[in-house]
Amino acid sequence: MVLQQTEPTDGADRKASDGPLTVTAPVPYAAGPTLRNPFPPIADYGFLSDCETTCLISSAGSVEWLCVPRPDSPSVFGAILDRGAGHFRLGPYGVSVPAARRYLPGSLILETTWQTHTGWLIVRDALVMGPWHDIDTRSRTHRRTPMDWDAEHILLRTVRCVSGTVELVMSCEPAFDYHRVSATWEYSGPAYGEAIARASRNPDSHPTLRLTTNLRIGIEGREARARTRLTEGDNVFVALSWSKHPAPQTYEEAADKMWKTSEAWRQWINVGDFPDHPWRAYLQRSALTLKGLTYSPTGALLAAPTTSLPETPQGERNWDYRYSWIRDSTFALWGLYTLGLDREADDFFSFIADVSGANNGERHPLQVMYGVGGERSLVEEELHHLSGYDNSRPVRIGNGAYNQRQHDIWGTMLDSVYLHAKSREQIPDALWPVLKNQVEEAIKHWKEPDRGIWEVRGEPQHFTSSKIMCWVALDRGSKLAELQGEKSYAQQWRAIAEEIKADVLARGVDKRGVLTQRYGDDALDASLLLAVLTRFLPADDPRIRATVLAIADELTEDGLVLRYRVEETDDGLAGEEGTFTICSFWLVSALVEIGEISRAKHLCERLLSFASPLHLYAEEIEPRTGRHLGNFPQAFTHLALINAVVHVIRAEEEADSSGVFVPANAPM
């Protein structure tokens, strides 16, 4: 990928509105924090998952975010939010910058290569997955149909000295309950190979951590340490476990578990349909990340594995994303479906049947979000004792948006079900009453204001994108009714869909023919790009073209897309925010739809240049520095990347084969 560098001729920053989008050279992703900042750049973290637990590892080899047993449980390592809130480092003594880092291809196994003055080390990290192990007894947590592979609840770290001699150090200092309860260590046997960490208060209320290794563990207060000199050919393993599943006792056993974990991931990714294209690596990494954000026991899908990574440095826009949003989840299924990965949809729809009460004859209204176990109450609170990432307070757990009224969720849900049902030509019987209820909710409430797709904490408004998604609910609902043989519903719902569309076109379009953020106002909003991606209007409609180009030219900073202008939108918060990466990828897809292929490709290339060294994305990007902001990695961004990249690749292929581009049929 060759990118041309452009510089302003007048010495000032040129705005996107001055001309078409330009491709600039990639900027260093770590330009925000300085070397003196004790917090690593957000983009420096690696992401691990076993589809039950997630963790983040810094480039220095330190586990700085781990919540067990669930991703929304209190943290046991939380240094990403406070440097004293727990860590687990394994690496060479005196060296904190690795020679190289990568994921083993097709997996979520992180490999870090270290060079010292005297030798070389290779460290591999994984959350272990193995063959399904609950044979004689049923799992207490799994509600979905058992698969071939399952989490073993072990964080496994292996070390191999490949050249010379290297001094290896290990430091494991958990801090339970978000650093509110310290740890106490004790040996679990007569030798030094295993130790157990428990909470110093109410240990039965917190997980027990077991550290198993072929190193000699020393207990120093709240910390378990080890230090040894390795020579070429030496191998070390360290396993941290928190359940009854046995940890490896030898390096050979550890290596076998690492191989089985890689095999689990590769068997999953092999099912996908990936193009033979230079961007294939971005697609695969995004797909693996989305899979890693699933919670296999229930079928829920996380928005992100972290809480309170700031959208604005030292600002208040810090939120807990460790929950399952209906919107984010259904969009993620769209992205996976685009790549031929369809199995996760079955589990998520079963999760929806659970939380809506369809499986036990009850009827609950669909919420904006749920806990990964289906919890309906996600009360928000602030943890004042934590400094926050890079001193950005407050640190929040829970999310107060769970009881907001957001009218787009019915459309996203019905669209996702239709996307999968039309290829199978059937709807699960238990799901039809749930879907019918969502259509009825859209009919009942579409004329009312809501807080919109961006969950504004200001006053409810008549957001145009919410009305469009209500149209999607009725449009997809009518098509699902036809599949179900309910022709009267199909006819009735089509008529209401047309009523909604007429209302939007009468009240949500300005004098220029541009769709507006809300009724009665000319402000722009990036969510209106969904108007073309959901087929609300055809791509050749002049209002679609005007809207896409207005957003590209007027709602961008250095070519990257904002959600909205904060000075034009009452979102109930102070301060600025970065550009929303999902919106920039939406713009790529929308530009393809209206035939602006070259412009779309250039923007896509630029966005891919902002990826972290491990091809991961946070929620936002600071356009002038490339700094990642917000929770990390974020499902919303990765799903939009998949759709944008596939849009561009399909457009190129069609243009190459016929000389004429036909807009891609977006699944929505």
Swiss-Prot record:
Optimum pH is 7.1. The trehalase activity drops sharply at pH values of 6.5 and below, as well as at pH values of 8.0 and above. Shows an absolute requirement for Mg(2+) for activity. Mg(2+) cannot be replaced by Ca(2+), Mn(2+) or Zn(2+). This is Trehalase. Catalyzes the hydrolysis of alpha,alpha-trehalose into two molecules of D-glucose. Does not hydrolyze maltose, isomaltose, sucrose, cellobiose, p-nitrophenyl-alpha-D-glucopyranoside, and methyl-alpha-D-glucopyranoside. Is also inactive on alpha,beta-trehalose, beta,beta-trehalose, alpha,alpha-trehalose-6,6'-dibehenate, trehalulose, nigerose, and trehalose dimycolate. Its cofactor is Mg(2+); phosphate. Homomultimer of 20 or more subunits. Inhibited by pyrophosphate and polyphosphates. Also competitively inhibited by validoxylamine and castanospermine, but not by trehazolin. It catalyses: alpha,alpha-trehalose + H2O = alpha-D-glucose + beta-D-glucose. Gene3D superfamilies: 1.50.10.10. Keywords: Carbohydrate metabolism, Glycosidase, Hydrolase, Magnesium. Belongs to the glycosyl hydrolase 15 family. Its EC number is 3.2.1.28. Residues 1-23 are annotated as: Disordered. Pathway: Glycan degradation; trehalose degradation; D-glucose from alpha,alpha-trehalose: step 1/1. GO terms for biological process: trehalose catabolic process. SUPFAM superfamilies: Six-hairpin glycosidases. It holds the Pfam family Glyco_hydro_15. One of its GO terms (molecular function) is phosphate ion binding.
